[in-house]
């Protein structure tokens, strides 16, 4: 709620089957907060995550709530964190069918992609209308600080942003983004949305939560 009050544009939750990031009850709470504030609520997860004792399955979680956006990631159930995007051969007829169902009630159905993805025509065929670029490798390059590698990494992101836009896709980016690498990412073209996660917690220990949120908002929107 404090994030919304301070001016963030939306909230994202990644409810994994092991519940280590979020519980189903958290989704209901976030859903209500975003709905009241007219802010975007994004639910992230693997389309094929099945139900268990305490986890109703990803599809059920989405259908039981009111997200503005769903971001589909190829994470295995026990995977520590998202570390790669979808491969084109994974986007089969079952995937397409579920995307079609989601789009009846959800503004954006997005998929997690690597920075060398190229099959954007396939995404249009499936019905995907948004992508999230996995920026883990990009963040590592910026952290290393080698100018020629930074330039190369920015070119990769710029090309994928341009290709996605040519295919009328909303472009998001996320993973390991922070105050140090966001300025470099902003030079890579018209990215519509970024997701900031762990870095907010880390920076809050130094600057406090309110100042941290304000710093990110200023960095992103300046």
Predicted features, each with a name:
Residues 11-13, 39-45, 68-72, 109-111, ...:
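Hydrophobic faces of well-ordered beta-strands that scaffold small-molecule active sites
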Residues 31-91:
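Glycine/small-residue-rich loop that forms an oxyanion/phosphate-binding "nest" at active or ligand-binding sites
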Residues 110-156, 160-163:
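Histidine/lysine/aspartate-rich catalytic loop segments that bind and position anionic ligands
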Residues 70-126:
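Hydrophobic, well-structured mid-protein blocks that either form specific transmembrane helices
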Residues 50-64, 116-127, 173, 177-191:
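Catalytic cores of alpha/beta
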Residues 9-32, 74-87, 135-148, 204:
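Glycine-rich, proline-tolerant flexible connector loops at the mouths of alpha/beta enzymes
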Residues 1-49, 63-65, 122-126, 149-152:
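Conserved N-terminal beta1-alpha1 strand-loop-helix module at the mouth
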Residues 31-35, 95-106, 124, 158-166, ...:
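Surface-exposed amphipathic alpha-helices with a cationic face
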